[in-house]
């Protein structure tokens, strides 16, 4: 099997799959290079103990169209040479779409992990990537019953499996370790990250968010994403003027989990952190108008705030009513995926 990866969330998902697949199936990977910051890429491979990708492409810093086209060309050449039994893609990035389209054009079976998600906002590039990938995939692994429902409404009913969320495997694996961490800071804090274009690619919008974070009743530890950092420089925003915001560099995966664990609440526009906050029993405020992770909105565990940014403080003060330990599975998603793929492959041979 060839797995196509290129973004931070995909490295996390692939680490879980590799752990589950050891001794059972052969996996090679293509790294498209979509994420290029050291903490967003190379350190992840060391920290997550992911095998070094057999192939590396250079797709950073391009527009959506040129980036996807560049990936398509590179992935197709590799697939023609490797002739894998199937190609596996994760999530909803340009890497996901490029991997799926490349395999589809070559009639190689496609496996989509995290299938069926819908935000119902087609202005999001990720939403288009999800839909197109699902409609080319042969085997679709869903994180929740809602994913299966969404696929069914679009006429996709065959090859669909409910397995839970593969990111939960790694979160539970890490937090199960019996180790007491030193306290990260000598103050209580909210943990914040931002990277979506609609939040960070406009100076006025970005300043509005910083202004509100600066008024919150506890300090905000702000892990600055590479995209956000570039824009802060471009817009000549002096972050030192926001005394309530403590800026740190983007964090490696486990450090990010540590920051969530010690925080009072999480403020983000990240998809993955909405789930990680839930699993780590932290209130999450999502600075978006919609989310594909609709289940987290239940019981006030996650709340969407987009237009009325001043609502963030009030939303944080609303304590979640309940956390469901079974949301998105029980931490064995990787094993379910591997076993299903092996069983289906053996059936096809017979």
Segments predicted by a language model, with ranges:
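Nucleotide-activated sugar donor-binding and catalytic core shared by glycosyltransferases
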Residues: 1-219, 228-350
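Conserved C-terminal portion of the radical SAM core fold
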Residues: 225
């Amino acid at each position: 099997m060839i797995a196509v990866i290129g973004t931070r969330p995909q490295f996390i998902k692939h680490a879980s799959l590799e752990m589950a697949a050891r001794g059972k199936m052969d996996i090679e990977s293509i790294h498209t290079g979509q994420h290029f910051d050291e903490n967003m890429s190379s350190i992840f491979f060391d920290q997550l103990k992911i095998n070094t990708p057999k192939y590396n492409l250079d797709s950073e810093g391009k527009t959506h169209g040129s980036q996807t086209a560049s990936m398509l060309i590179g992935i197709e050449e590799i697939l023609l040479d490797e002739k894998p039994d199937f190609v596996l893609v994760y999530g909803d990035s340009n890497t996901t779409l490029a991997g799926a389209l490349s395999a589809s054009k070559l009639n190689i079976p496609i496996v989509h992990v995290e299938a069926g998600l819908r935000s119902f906002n087609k202005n999001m590039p990720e939403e288009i990537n999800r839909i197109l990938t699902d409609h080319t995939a042969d085997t679709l692994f869903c994180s929740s019953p809602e994913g299966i429902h969404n696929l069914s409404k679009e006429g996709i009913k065959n090859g669909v499996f409910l397995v839970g969320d593969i990111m939960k495997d790694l979160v539970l694996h890490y937090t199960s370790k019996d180790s007491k961490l030193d306290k990260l800071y000598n103050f209580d804090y909210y943990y914040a990250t931002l990277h979506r274009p609609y939040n960070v690619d406009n100076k006025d919008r970005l300043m509005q968010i910083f202004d509100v974070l600066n008024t919150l009743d506890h300090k905000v530890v702000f892990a600055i994403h590479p995209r956000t950092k570039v824009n802060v420089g471009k817009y000549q925003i002096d972050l030192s003027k926001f005394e309530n915001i403590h800026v740190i560099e983007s964090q490696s995966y486990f450090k990010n989990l540590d920051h969530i664990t010690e925080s009072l609440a999480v403020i983000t526009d990240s998809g993955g952190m909405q789930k990680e906050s839930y699993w780590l029993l932290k209130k999450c405020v999502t600075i978006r108008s919609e989310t594909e992770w609709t289940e987290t909105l239940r019981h006030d565990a996650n709340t969407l705030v987009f237009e009325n940014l001043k609502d963030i403080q009030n939303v944080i003060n609303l304590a979640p009513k309940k956390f469901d330990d079974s949301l998105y599975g029980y931490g064995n998603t990787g094993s379910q995926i591997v076993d299903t793929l092996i069983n289906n492959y053996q059936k096809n041979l017979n």
